[in-house]
Amino acid sequence: IQGTLILGNADSPVMLGSNQVIVEEQGKLSGFGGVAGNLSNSGIVDLTTYMPGNILTVGGNYTGRNGLILLQTETGGDNSKTDRLVIKGNASGRTRVAVTQAGGTGAETLNGIEVIHVSGNADNAEFIQTERITAGAYDYILKRGQGINSTNWYLISRKDIPVPQPEAVPENHDNNLR
């Protein structure tokens, strides 16, 4: 894909039957549905074409080639509405992830809001947050899951801890010295 390819719509998602879909550097894949085979991303995969909850499914492997994924998420707890990338095979390479806040006032997460799910191996995959996400008193950070969830990526909330200001140092007066 060198231009823009839009898959289906919210009422009628489309699954591309191709074995290999390549999103070139200037290309963009968006819409509703997925790719039956492998997806290589050097461009943009945009899931933000509707309200949060869009799922792009890759039936094969996903390879990030410094491409970008655009997602929308309601910033709340673990069960917040979000766009998701679901990879049935393996994931590898480096991909940047930009998340647009689509409502929500922030809340504590336990496991996090799952935004990327990989069924296969993801040892050689990097999904990197592009910018800060804040809601209320919370910052959201894109992190790889742990244990049995280590092939998935989550938006984890943490309290926005204010940076303490240095204490004022009292002036030193000679008459205080003994």
For every predicted segment, state its role.
Residues 1-90, 94, 100, 105-159:
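Extracellular beta-solenoid/beta-roll
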Residues 162:
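Extracytoplasmic Gram-positive cell-surface binding/anchoring modules and repeats
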Residues 165-178:
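Outer membrane beta-barrel translocator domains of Type V secretion systems
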